[in-house]
Curated annotation (Swiss-Prot):
The keyword GTP-binding does not apply. Its cofactor is Mg(2+). GO terms for biological process: metabolite repair; nicotinamide nucleotide metabolic process. Pfam families: Carb_kinase (PF01256). ATP binds at residues 194-198, 213-222. It catalyses: (6S)-NADHX + ATP = ADP + phosphate + NADH + H(+); (6S)-NADPHX + ATP = ADP + phosphate + NADPH + H(+). (6S)-NADPHX binds at residues 107, 160-166, 223. It comes from Entamoeba histolytica (strain ATCC 30459 / HM-1:IMSS / ABRM). Its EC number is 4.2.1.93. CDD domains: YXKO-related. Keywords: ATP-binding, Lyase, NAD, NADP, Nucleotide-binding, Phosphoprotein. This is ATP-dependent (S)-NAD(P)H-hydrate dehydratase. Belongs to the NnrD/CARKD family.
Length: 300
């Protein structure tokens, strides 16, 4: 890890204590832009993971053809059928003033009109006091508009292997370019590069997450990560002592949590592990990793 960053100490400050006098919203609110007629599971996985980690409210802004399916998956999620012929971006922007974190991309699809609307929202969301996580089709979208995020300290990119390669292609660098160099090329945005060993960097700080995870790679794990990360960064924004480096700490925390959940689910379901099994393990695994007595993270 480059520089000195006390991840455990920051997380102790960031993770809110549960008290009987707290109110709804005190533990954070997040929003997800995603969901299309083909992909209804991804935004659900992201939103429900955010709730399982511990945020209070999760909004999903999706294509109207995906809304009923997502609503039927869980009554816990607040689903807005936004992408339609007469859409108004202000419908989303007014809600973004009430949340601390925004995930863009899960199941979004690549319909041209949806991409155009999402880009319009993203341009304005970046100026708000929220953290924005770009994943999946959100990364595909931003590859053509990297100047929009360059130098922005409220941005986290969460590319998998193929998404990282596409990002490197756009930047005209080798696929083997280290994460910290790519982060610097983008002006210090935070990157959580997913892999067997997740790497987190903003160019100044670099952390390798050493939790083992699972050999089972089922669909939806990236969505579980994006939702989990959204809750951690929402908590960080609610903290009066917020620091830009908290995005590194939150990314490490989310990575460690999802890898441990994946490992736990694998011991129970083996080859049959699906994303829902990983999500189901979040509450108990969270207490093991982030218990009140000691935060147990493995990284370097």
């Amino acid at each position: 890890m480059g520089g000195q960053l006390s991840i455990e100490a920051r997380l102790k400050s960031i993770i809110p204590q549960l008290t009987f006098d707290s109110h709804k919203g005190a533990c954070g609110k997040v929003a997800i832009i995603g969901g299309s007629v083909e992909y209804t599971g991804a935004p659900y996985f992201s939103g429900i993971s955010a709730l399982r980690v511990g945020c209070d409210l999760a909004h999903i802004f999706c294509h109207q053809d995906a809304a009923i399916a997502i609503k039927s998956y869980s009554p816990e999620l607040i689903v807005h059928p936004f992408f339609k012929e007469d859409y108004d971006t202000n419908e989303v922007l007014k809600w973004l003033d009430t949340v601390q974190a925004l995930v863009v991309g899960p199941g979004l699809g690549r319909d041209e009109s949806v991409m155009e609307a999402t880009l319009s929202i993203l341009k304005q969301a970046i100026t708000k006091n929220i953290i924005i996580i770009l994943d999946a089709d959100g990364l595909f979208l931003i590859n053509n508009h990297l100047d929009l995020i360059r130098g922005k300290k409220n941005i986290i990119l969460t590319p998998n292997v193929m998404e990282y390669r596409r990002l490197c292609d756009v930047l005209k660098v080798s696929h083997n370019t280290p994460c910290n160099k790519v982060a610097l090329m983008l002006g210090g945005v935070t990157i959580l590069q997913k892999g067997q060993v997740d790497e987190v960097s903003n160019g100044s700080y670099t952390v390798h997450v050493k939790h083992v995870g699972s050999p089972r790679r089922c669909g939806g794990q990236g969505d579980v990560l994006s939702g989990s990360l959204a809750t951690f960064v929402a908590w960080s924004k609610l903290n009066q002592d917020f620091q830009d480096e908290d995005l590194i700490c939150c990314s490490v925390a989310a990575s460690a949590l999802v890898k441990e959940c994946s490992s736990f689910a694998f011991t129970e379901k083996h080859r049959g592990v699906i994303a829902s099994d990983i999500i189901e393990s979040i509450p108990s695994v969270f207490d093991q990793v982030f218990g009140q007595n000691k935060i147990q993270l493995i990284y370097e």
